[in-house]
């Protein structure tokens, strides 16, 4: 019985769970995507696997795209400088 529990727990840990997060989507240089309209951001976010997105006006990084439920594999804006501009 204990072996069954241990094996079940091991299988649970080995399965990859794709989680999502809400964040500013970023390019490879840690720069946000500048925006002026919600449809632009929604398209950008959904093309990258998010549920939706919108333009966050006058936010922490200026006018930038904010994505809802963005997959872990997509880069997000992290603290530090934007290296591309």
Swiss-Prot record:
Molecular function in Gene Ontology: sodium channel inhibitor activity; toxin activity
Q: What is known of its domains?
A: Has the structural arrangement of an alpha-helix connected to antiparallel beta-sheets by disulfide bonds (CS-alpha/beta).
Recorded hits in PROSITE patterns, A to Z, give:
LCN_CSAB (PS51863)
The family database entries (InterPro entries) matched by this protein are listed as: LCN-type_CS_alpha_beta_dom (IPR044062), Scorpion_toxin-like (IPR003614), Scorpion_toxin-like_sf (IPR036574), Scorpion_toxinL (IPR018218), Scorpion_toxinL/defensin (IPR002061)
Q: Which domain of life is it from?
A: Eukaryota
Which tissues is this chain's protein expressed in?
Answer: Expressed by the venom gland.
Per its record, how is this protein called by name? Makatoxin-2
- Give the organism, scientific name: Olivierus martensii (Manchurian scorpion)
**GO CC terms on record?**
extracellular region
Q: Keyword annotations for this protein?
A: Disulfide bond, Neurotoxin, Secreted, Signal, Toxin
Q: Where is the signal peptide?
A: 1-19
The record's disulfide annotation reads 31-82, 35-55, 41-65, 45-67
